[in-house]
Curated annotation (Swiss-Prot):
The protein, known as: Replicative DNA helicase DnaB
Binding site for ATP: A231, R232, P233, S234, M235, G236, K237, T238
Subunit organization: Homohexamer.
Keywords in alphabetical order: ATP-binding, DNA replication, DNA-binding, Helicase, Hydrolase, Isomerase, Nucleotide-binding, Primosome
Protein species of origin: Escherichia coli O157:H7
Length: 471
Protein backbone atom coordinates (compact mmCIF):
# COMPACT_ATOMS: atom_id res chain seq x y z
CA UNK A 1 0.00 0.00 0.00
CA UNK A 2 1.28 3.46 -0.92
CA UNK A 3 2.08 6.02 1.71
CA UNK A 4 3.81 3.74 4.31
CA UNK A 5 5.86 6.53 5.83
CA UNK A 6 7.27 6.65 9.35
CA UNK A 7 5.27 8.61 11.90
CA UNK A 8 6.09 12.28 11.89
CA UNK A 9 4.35 14.47 14.44
CA UNK A 10 5.00 17.49 12.23
CA UNK A 11 2.32 16.12 9.91
CA UNK A 12 -0.20 16.90 12.65
CA UNK A 13 1.20 20.18 13.88
CA UNK A 14 1.65 23.44 11.92
CA UNK A 15 5.31 24.22 11.27
CA UNK A 16 6.06 27.60 12.82
CA UNK A 17 9.67 27.25 13.99
CA UNK A 18 11.13 30.28 12.17
CA UNK A 19 12.64 32.54 14.87
CA UNK A 20 11.13 35.56 13.12
CA UNK A 21 7.63 34.27 13.75
CA UNK A 22 8.27 32.48 17.02
CA UNK A 23 6.61 35.31 18.90
CA UNK A 24 3.34 34.95 17.02
CA UNK A 25 0.42 33.59 18.99
CA UNK A 26 -0.77 30.16 17.93
CA UNK A 27 -4.58 29.79 17.83
CA UNK A 28 -5.97 27.60 20.64
CA UNK A 29 -6.07 23.91 19.78
CA UNK A 30 -5.39 20.48 21.22
CA UNK A 31 -3.59 18.09 18.90
CA UNK A 32 -3.87 15.36 21.54
CA UNK A 33 -7.66 15.71 21.82
CA UNK A 34 -8.03 15.64 18.03
CA UNK A 35 -5.84 12.54 17.80
CA UNK A 36 -7.82 10.84 20.56
CA UNK A 37 -11.12 11.52 18.76
CA UNK A 38 -9.85 10.12 15.46
CA UNK A 39 -8.14 7.16 17.10
CA UNK A 40 -11.18 6.43 19.25
CA UNK A 41 -13.46 6.32 16.20
CA UNK A 42 -11.20 3.72 14.60
CA UNK A 43 -11.44 1.64 17.77
CA UNK A 44 -15.21 1.98 18.24
CA UNK A 45 -17.39 2.91 15.25
CA UNK A 46 -20.46 2.90 17.51
CA UNK A 47 -19.31 6.20 19.03
CA UNK A 48 -19.67 8.00 15.70
CA UNK A 49 -23.05 9.54 16.54
CA UNK A 50 -21.76 10.88 19.87
CA UNK A 51 -18.88 12.59 18.10
CA UNK A 52 -20.86 13.82 15.07
CA UNK A 53 -23.29 15.62 17.38
CA UNK A 54 -20.40 17.58 18.82
CA UNK A 55 -17.94 18.33 16.02
CA UNK A 56 -17.69 18.79 12.27
CA UNK A 57 -14.61 18.50 10.09
CA UNK A 58 -13.86 22.23 10.23
CA UNK A 59 -13.56 22.04 14.02
CA UNK A 60 -10.23 20.22 13.67
CA UNK A 61 -7.22 22.52 13.72
CA UNK A 62 -4.90 20.70 11.33
CA UNK A 63 -5.66 20.05 7.68
CA UNK A 64 -4.66 16.35 7.92
CA UNK A 65 -7.11 15.82 10.77
CA UNK A 66 -9.87 17.57 8.80
CA UNK A 67 -9.22 15.29 5.83
CA UNK A 68 -9.22 12.19 8.04
CA UNK A 69 -12.50 13.11 9.74
CA UNK A 70 -14.13 13.94 6.39
CA UNK A 71 -13.14 10.53 5.06
CA UNK A 72 -14.47 8.86 8.20
CA UNK A 73 -17.79 10.60 7.61
CA UNK A 74 -17.85 9.36 4.03
CA UNK A 75 -17.23 5.78 5.19
CA UNK A 76 -19.94 6.08 7.83
CA UNK A 77 -22.48 7.38 5.32
CA UNK A 78 -21.72 4.54 2.92
CA UNK A 79 -22.16 1.94 5.66
CA UNK A 80 -18.52 0.88 5.59
CA UNK A 81 -16.54 0.15 8.76
CA UNK A 82 -14.02 2.72 9.96
CA UNK A 83 -10.72 1.03 10.75
CA UNK A 84 -7.07 1.39 9.89
CA UNK A 85 -7.29 -0.54 6.62
CA UNK A 86 -10.56 0.89 5.23
CA UNK A 87 -9.60 4.44 6.18
CA UNK A 88 -6.16 4.19 4.58
CA UNK A 89 -7.62 2.65 1.40
CA UNK A 90 -10.28 5.35 1.20
CA UNK A 91 -7.79 8.16 1.68
CA UNK A 92 -5.50 6.64 -0.94
CA UNK A 93 -8.36 6.54 -3.47
CA UNK A 94 -8.91 10.23 -2.80
CA UNK A 95 -5.20 10.91 -3.28
CA UNK A 96 -4.85 12.21 0.28
CA UNK A 97 -3.08 9.43 2.16
CA UNK A 98 0.37 10.98 1.85
CA UNK A 99 -0.89 14.43 2.79
CA UNK A 100 -2.29 13.18 6.12
CA UNK A 101 0.95 11.47 7.13
CA UNK A 102 0.59 8.12 5.42
CA UNK A 103 -0.39 4.73 6.77
CA UNK A 104 2.12 5.08 9.58
CA UNK A 105 0.38 8.15 11.01
CA UNK A 106 -3.03 6.45 10.90
CA UNK A 107 -1.52 3.44 12.66
CA UNK A 108 0.00 5.72 15.27
CA UNK A 109 -3.43 7.31 15.90
CA UNK A 110 -4.97 3.92 16.49
CA UNK A 111 -2.08 2.61 18.57
CA UNK A 112 -1.83 5.63 20.87
CA UNK A 113 -5.54 5.61 21.75
CA UNK A 114 -6.10 2.82 24.30
CA UNK A 115 -9.92 3.12 24.32
CA UNK A 116 -12.85 5.24 23.17
CA UNK A 117 -14.28 5.58 26.68
CA UNK A 118 -13.63 9.33 26.93
CA UNK A 119 -14.17 10.20 23.28
CA UNK A 120 -17.14 12.50 24.00
CA UNK A 121 -15.03 14.58 26.37
CA UNK A 122 -12.24 14.78 23.80
CA UNK A 123 -14.75 15.88 21.16
CA UNK A 124 -16.01 18.60 23.50
CA UNK A 125 -12.45 19.89 23.83
CA UNK A 126 -12.04 19.96 20.05
CA UNK A 127 -15.30 21.84 19.66
CA UNK A 128 -14.48 24.28 22.48
CA UNK A 129 -11.12 25.21 20.93
CA UNK A 130 -12.79 25.57 17.52
CA UNK A 131 -15.32 28.05 18.92
CA UNK A 132 -12.53 30.13 20.46
CA UNK A 133 -10.68 30.13 17.12
CA UNK A 134 -13.86 31.28 15.40
CA UNK A 135 -14.12 34.12 17.90
CA UNK A 136 -10.52 35.13 17.20
CA UNK A 137 -11.18 35.04 13.46
CA UNK A 138 -14.30 37.16 13.82
CA UNK A 139 -12.45 39.62 16.06
CA UNK A 140 -9.77 39.98 13.39
CA UNK A 141 -12.45 40.46 10.73
CA UNK A 142 -14.13 43.16 12.81
CA UNK A 143 -10.77 44.87 13.42
CA UNK A 144 -9.99 44.85 9.69
CA UNK A 145 -13.43 46.29 8.94
CA UNK A 146 -12.75 49.03 11.49
CA UNK A 147 -9.43 49.95 9.86
CA UNK A 148 -11.00 49.79 6.37
CA UNK A 149 -14.75 50.46 6.75
CA UNK A 150 -15.29 50.95 2.99
CA UNK A 151 -17.98 53.56 3.52
CA UNK A 152 -19.75 51.74 6.34
CA UNK A 153 -20.89 53.72 9.37
CA UNK A 154 -20.14 52.78 12.95
CA UNK A 155 -23.71 51.43 13.23
CA UNK A 156 -23.08 49.22 10.19
CA UNK A 157 -19.90 47.93 11.79
CA UNK A 158 -21.72 47.25 15.06
CA UNK A 159 -24.35 45.26 13.17
CA UNK A 160 -21.58 43.33 11.41
CA UNK A 161 -19.89 42.56 14.73
CA UNK A 162 -23.10 41.44 16.42
CA UNK A 163 -24.27 39.31 13.51
CA UNK A 164 -20.91 37.53 13.23
CA UNK A 165 -20.65 36.86 16.98
CA UNK A 166 -24.29 35.77 17.22
CA UNK A 167 -23.72 33.42 14.29
CA UNK A 168 -21.10 31.62 16.36
CA UNK A 169 -23.43 31.52 19.37
CA UNK A 170 -26.28 30.21 17.23
CA UNK A 171 -24.09 27.49 15.78
CA UNK A 172 -22.99 26.50 19.28
CA UNK A 173 -26.58 26.48 20.55
CA UNK A 174 -27.67 24.20 17.73
CA UNK A 175 -25.03 21.68 18.82
CA UNK A 176 -26.76 21.43 22.19
CA UNK A 177 -30.12 20.57 20.66
CA UNK A 178 -31.32 17.04 20.08
CA UNK A 179 -33.85 14.43 21.11
CA UNK A 180 -35.30 14.76 24.61
CA UNK A 181 -36.59 11.88 26.68
CA UNK A 182 -40.35 11.91 27.22
CA UNK A 183 -39.79 12.20 30.98
CA UNK A 184 -38.03 15.55 30.50
CA UNK A 185 -40.70 16.77 28.09
CA UNK A 186 -43.47 15.73 30.48
CA UNK A 187 -41.81 17.54 33.39
CA UNK A 188 -41.65 20.77 31.39
CA UNK A 189 -45.22 20.33 30.13
CA UNK A 190 -46.66 19.71 33.59
CA UNK A 191 -44.77 22.73 34.96
CA UNK A 192 -46.30 24.88 32.23
CA UNK A 193 -49.81 23.55 32.93
CA UNK A 194 -49.39 24.23 36.66
CA UNK A 195 -48.22 27.76 35.89
CA UNK A 196 -51.28 28.39 33.72
CA UNK A 197 -53.56 26.91 36.39
CA UNK A 198 -52.17 29.05 39.20
CA UNK A 199 -52.06 32.35 37.29
CA UNK A 200 -55.38 33.97 36.30
CA UNK A 201 -55.33 34.74 32.59
CA UNK A 202 -58.98 34.72 31.42
CA UNK A 203 -58.13 32.19 28.75
CA UNK A 204 -55.30 34.31 27.31
CA UNK A 205 -52.09 32.30 27.59
CA UNK A 206 -50.06 34.37 25.13
CA UNK A 207 -49.72 38.07 24.38
CA UNK A 208 -53.09 39.78 24.79
CA UNK A 209 -54.28 41.08 21.40
CA UNK A 210 -56.60 43.61 23.02
CA UNK A 211 -59.54 42.10 21.12
CA UNK A 212 -61.83 39.92 23.22
CA UNK A 213 -63.26 37.77 20.43
CA UNK A 214 -59.87 37.29 18.80
CA UNK A 215 -58.43 36.26 22.17
CA UNK A 216 -61.19 33.65 22.49
CA UNK A 217 -60.17 32.14 19.16
CA UNK A 218 -56.41 32.25 19.67
CA UNK A 219 -55.83 32.51 23.46
CA UNK A 220 -53.56 35.42 22.53
CA UNK A 221 -50.45 35.55 20.37
CA UNK A 222 -48.40 32.57 21.49
CA UNK A 223 -44.66 32.64 22.22
CA UNK A 224 -42.51 31.07 19.47
CA UNK A 225 -45.34 31.45 16.89
CA UNK A 226 -44.87 32.98 13.45
CA UNK A 227 -48.05 34.97 12.79
CA UNK A 228 -48.85 36.16 9.28
CA UNK A 229 -51.19 39.13 8.78
CA UNK A 230 -52.18 39.54 5.13
CA UNK A 231 -54.58 41.68 3.14
CA UNK A 232 -55.01 43.50 -0.14
CA UNK A 233 -54.07 47.22 -0.19
CA UNK A 234 -56.34 49.63 1.75
CA UNK A 235 -57.70 46.89 4.01
CA UNK A 236 -55.65 48.13 6.98
CA UNK A 237 -53.05 45.44 7.56
CA UNK A 238 -50.42 47.88 8.86
CA UNK A 239 -53.04 49.52 11.08
CA UNK A 240 -54.15 46.16 12.47
CA UNK A 241 -50.58 45.01 13.11
CA UNK A 242 -49.74 48.33 14.78
CA UNK A 243 -52.85 48.01 16.96
CA UNK A 244 -51.62 44.58 18.07
CA UNK A 245 -48.26 46.16 18.95
CA UNK A 246 -49.89 49.08 20.77
CA UNK A 247 -52.20 46.82 22.76
CA UNK A 248 -49.30 44.55 23.71
CA UNK A 249 -47.20 47.54 24.79
CA UNK A 250 -50.00 48.98 26.91
CA UNK A 251 -50.99 45.67 28.54
CA UNK A 252 -47.49 44.47 29.45
CA UNK A 253 -44.09 45.89 30.36
CA UNK A 254 -41.87 43.85 28.04
CA UNK A 255 -40.53 45.75 25.02
CA UNK A 256 -42.19 45.39 21.63
CA UNK A 257 -40.07 45.74 18.51
CA UNK A 258 -41.27 47.08 15.15
CA UNK A 259 -39.34 46.60 11.91
CA UNK A 260 -40.94 49.05 9.48
CA UNK A 261 -39.34 48.42 6.10
CA UNK A 262 -41.94 50.48 4.24
CA UNK A 263 -42.85 53.43 6.46
CA UNK A 264 -40.53 55.88 8.32
CA UNK A 265 -40.62 55.86 12.09
CA UNK A 266 -42.19 59.34 12.33
CA UNK A 267 -45.13 58.21 10.21
CA UNK A 268 -45.51 55.09 12.34
CA UNK A 269 -45.57 57.25 15.47
CA UNK A 270 -48.18 59.61 14.00
CA UNK A 271 -50.43 56.62 13.39
CA UNK A 272 -49.91 55.37 16.93
CA UNK A 273 -50.69 58.77 18.41
CA UNK A 274 -53.91 58.91 16.37
CA UNK A 275 -54.83 55.37 17.41
CA UNK A 276 -54.14 55.73 21.12
CA UNK A 277 -55.39 59.33 21.44
CA UNK A 278 -58.49 58.86 19.27
CA UNK A 279 -57.51 61.95 17.28
CA UNK A 280 -58.10 62.13 13.52
CA UNK A 281 -54.79 61.18 11.90
CA UNK A 282 -55.34 63.74 9.11
CA UNK A 283 -55.40 66.49 11.72
CA UNK A 284 -52.15 65.16 13.18
CA UNK A 285 -50.43 64.97 9.77
CA UNK A 286 -51.49 68.53 8.89
CA UNK A 287 -50.99 70.00 12.35
CA UNK A 288 -54.58 71.30 12.46
CA UNK A 289 -55.18 70.46 16.11
CA UNK A 290 -57.40 72.13 18.67
CA UNK A 291 -56.86 72.28 22.42
CA UNK A 292 -58.75 69.06 23.07
CA UNK A 293 -56.67 67.23 20.45
CA UNK A 294 -53.46 68.49 22.04
CA UNK A 295 -54.65 67.38 25.46
CA UNK A 296 -55.38 63.88 24.18
CA UNK A 297 -52.07 63.62 22.37
CA UNK A 298 -50.13 64.95 25.37
CA UNK A 299 -51.76 62.37 27.61
CA UNK A 300 -50.84 59.58 25.20
CA UNK A 301 -47.26 60.83 24.90
CA UNK A 302 -46.98 60.82 28.68
CA UNK A 303 -48.03 57.17 28.83
CA UNK A 304 -45.67 56.16 26.01
CA UNK A 305 -42.73 57.97 27.61
CA UNK A 306 -43.49 56.43 30.97
CA UNK A 307 -43.54 52.89 29.59
CA UNK A 308 -40.75 53.38 27.02
CA UNK A 309 -41.24 49.86 25.73
CA UNK A 310 -41.81 50.44 22.00
CA UNK A 311 -38.79 50.22 19.68
CA UNK A 312 -38.98 51.12 15.98
CA UNK A 313 -36.39 50.19 13.34
CA UNK A 314 -37.26 51.77 9.98
CA UNK A 315 -34.21 50.50 8.07
CA UNK A 316 -35.11 49.39 4.55
CA UNK A 317 -34.12 46.15 2.85
CA UNK A 318 -33.16 44.33 6.04
CA UNK A 319 -31.82 40.80 5.82
CA UNK A 320 -32.90 38.00 8.18
CA UNK A 321 -29.46 38.14 9.79
CA UNK A 322 -29.84 41.85 10.53
CA UNK A 323 -33.34 41.38 11.94
CA UNK A 324 -32.12 38.54 14.17
CA UNK A 325 -29.10 40.45 15.48
CA UNK A 326 -31.12 43.58 16.28
CA UNK A 327 -33.89 41.60 17.94
CA UNK A 328 -31.35 39.69 20.00
CA UNK A 329 -29.77 42.93 21.14
CA UNK A 330 -33.08 44.29 22.44
CA UNK A 331 -33.86 40.94 24.08
CA UNK A 332 -30.46 40.86 25.75
CA UNK A 333 -30.69 44.44 27.01
CA UNK A 334 -34.20 44.01 28.46
CA UNK A 335 -34.33 40.37 29.47
CA UNK A 336 -36.71 39.39 26.68
CA UNK A 337 -39.18 40.79 24.13
CA UNK A 338 -42.97 40.76 24.26
CA UNK A 339 -43.69 40.97 20.53
CA UNK A 340 -41.91 41.52 17.20
CA UNK A 341 -43.71 43.01 14.18
CA UNK A 342 -42.32 43.17 10.63
CA UNK A 343 -43.93 45.35 7.96
CA UNK A 344 -43.65 43.65 5.58
CA UNK A 345 -42.12 40.27 4.80
CA UNK A 346 -41.66 40.72 1.03
CA UNK A 347 -39.48 43.81 1.56
CA UNK A 348 -36.82 41.77 3.35
CA UNK A 349 -33.86 40.57 1.30
CA UNK A 350 -31.44 37.65 1.17
CA UNK A 351 -28.64 38.84 -1.14
CA UNK A 352 -27.29 35.35 -1.76
CA UNK A 353 -30.70 34.22 -3.06
CA UNK A 354 -31.77 37.39 -4.88
CA UNK A 355 -31.82 35.57 -8.23
CA UNK A 356 -34.51 33.15 -7.05
CA UNK A 357 -37.46 34.90 -5.41
CA UNK A 358 -39.13 31.66 -4.33
CA UNK A 359 -36.03 30.48 -2.47
CA UNK A 360 -35.49 33.97 -1.06
CA UNK A 361 -39.00 34.14 0.42
CA UNK A 362 -38.63 30.59 1.75
CA UNK A 363 -35.42 31.55 3.57
CA UNK A 364 -37.01 34.73 4.99
CA UNK A 365 -40.03 32.79 6.22
CA UNK A 366 -37.88 30.04 7.72
CA UNK A 367 -35.62 32.54 9.47
CA UNK A 368 -38.55 34.43 11.02
CA UNK A 369 -39.95 31.20 12.42
CA UNK A 370 -36.50 30.34 13.77
CA UNK A 371 -36.30 33.79 15.39
CA UNK A 372 -39.70 33.33 17.06
CA UNK A 373 -38.59 29.98 18.44
CA UNK A 374 -35.15 31.16 19.54
CA UNK A 375 -36.40 34.20 21.47
CA UNK A 376 -39.65 32.49 22.51
CA UNK A 377 -41.66 35.46 21.26
CA UNK A 378 -44.56 35.87 18.83
CA UNK A 379 -43.36 37.31 15.52
CA UNK A 380 -46.05 39.11 13.50
CA UNK A 381 -45.07 39.46 9.84
CA UNK A 382 -47.21 41.30 7.31
CA UNK A 383 -47.55 39.80 3.85
CA UNK A 384 -48.93 40.80 0.50
CA UNK A 385 -51.68 38.92 -1.33
CA UNK A 386 -51.84 37.96 -4.98
CA UNK A 387 -53.90 40.17 -7.30
CA UNK A 388 -55.74 37.13 -8.63
CA UNK A 389 -58.31 37.26 -5.83
CA UNK A 390 -59.63 40.50 -7.36
CA UNK A 391 -61.06 38.40 -10.20
CA UNK A 392 -63.26 36.35 -7.84
CA UNK A 393 -66.82 37.20 -6.91
CA UNK A 394 -66.07 36.54 -3.24
CA UNK A 395 -62.90 38.47 -2.52
CA UNK A 396 -62.38 37.13 0.97
CA UNK A 397 -58.78 35.84 1.07
CA UNK A 398 -57.76 32.21 1.50
CA UNK A 399 -54.35 30.74 2.26
CA UNK A 400 -53.48 30.16 -1.39
CA UNK A 401 -53.80 33.93 -2.02
CA UNK A 402 -50.59 34.60 -0.08
CA UNK A 403 -47.93 35.84 -2.47
CA UNK A 404 -45.18 33.19 -2.73
CA UNK A 405 -47.55 31.26 -0.49
CA UNK A 406 -45.97 27.80 -0.24
CA UNK A 407 -43.22 28.43 2.29
CA UNK A 408 -45.13 31.15 4.16
CA UNK A 409 -48.17 28.96 4.66
CA UNK A 410 -45.98 26.05 5.76
CA UNK A 411 -43.92 28.01 8.31
CA UNK A 412 -46.76 30.08 9.79
CA UNK A 413 -48.44 28.98 13.01
CA UNK A 414 -51.27 31.50 12.63
CA UNK A 415 -52.51 33.20 9.46
CA UNK A 416 -54.94 36.10 9.73
CA UNK A 417 -56.51 37.87 6.74
CA UNK A 418 -58.24 41.25 6.90
CA UNK A 419 -61.33 41.83 4.78
CA UNK A 420 -63.53 44.93 4.73
CA UNK A 421 -66.51 44.60 2.42
CA UNK A 422 -66.90 48.36 2.04
CA UNK A 423 -63.61 48.53 0.11
CA UNK A 424 -65.24 46.63 -2.76
CA UNK A 425 -68.90 47.60 -2.28
CA UNK A 426 -69.65 51.27 -1.67
CA UNK A 427 -73.16 50.54 -0.43
CA UNK A 428 -72.18 47.57 1.73
CA UNK A 429 -74.28 46.80 4.78
CA UNK A 430 -71.01 46.07 6.61
CA UNK A 431 -69.57 49.58 6.59
CA UNK A 432 -67.14 50.12 9.43
CA UNK A 433 -66.88 46.37 10.03
CA UNK A 434 -63.71 44.37 9.45
CA UNK A 435 -63.48 40.61 9.25
CA UNK A 436 -60.38 38.98 10.70
CA UNK A 437 -60.32 35.65 8.91
CA UNK A 438 -58.21 32.98 10.61
CA UNK A 439 -57.07 30.88 7.66
CA UNK A 440 -54.70 28.70 9.65
CA UNK A 441 -54.07 28.07 13.32
CA UNK A 442 -51.72 25.25 14.14
CA UNK A 443 -53.04 24.79 17.67
CA UNK A 444 -56.58 26.12 17.49
CA UNK A 445 -59.70 26.62 15.39
CA UNK A 446 -60.04 28.62 12.21
CA UNK A 447 -62.93 31.00 11.63
CA UNK A 448 -63.82 34.69 11.42
CA UNK A 449 -63.90 37.44 14.02
CA UNK A 450 -65.55 40.81 13.50
CA UNK A 451 -63.92 44.08 14.57
CA UNK A 452 -64.97 47.69 14.19
CA UNK A 453 -62.76 49.75 11.86
CA UNK A 454 -62.21 53.43 12.65
CA UNK A 455 -60.04 54.59 9.79
CA UNK A 456 -59.85 58.21 10.90
CA UNK A 457 -58.11 57.07 14.06
CA UNK A 458 -56.09 54.31 12.37
CA UNK A 459 -57.80 51.94 14.78
CA UNK A 460 -59.53 48.56 14.98
CA UNK A 461 -61.76 48.11 18.04
CA UNK A 462 -63.83 45.38 19.62
CA UNK A 463 -67.10 44.81 17.76
CA UNK A 464 -70.23 45.24 19.87
CA UNK A 465 -72.57 43.34 17.53
CA UNK A 466 -72.92 39.57 17.06
CA UNK A 467 -70.03 37.50 15.79
CA UNK A 468 -70.59 35.00 12.99
CA UNK A 469 -70.65 32.14 15.44
CA UNK A 470 -73.44 33.89 17.38
CA UNK A 471 -75.72 34.50 14.41
Amino acid sequence: MAGNKPFNKQQAEPRERDPQVAGLKVPPHSIEAEQSVLGGLMLDNERWDDVAERVVADDFYTRPHRHIFTEMARLQESGSPIDLITLAESLERQGQLDSVGGFAYLAELSKNTPSAANISSYADIVRERAVVREMISVANEIAEAGFDPQGRTSEDLLDLAESRVFKIAESRANKDEGPKNIADVLDATVARIEQLFQQPHDGVTGVNTGYDDLNKKTAGLQPSDLIIVAARPSMGKTTFAMNLVENAAMLQDKPVLIFSLEMPSEQIMMRSLASLSRVDQTKIRTGQLDDEDWARISGTMGILLEKRNIYIDDSSGLTPTEVRSRARRIAREHGGIGLIMIDYLQLMRVPALSDNRTLEIAEISRSLKALAKELNVPVVALSQLNRSLEQRADKRPVNSDLRESGSIEQDADLIMFIYRDEVYHENSDLKGIAEIIIGKQRNGPIGTVRLTFNGQWSRFDNYAGPQYDDE
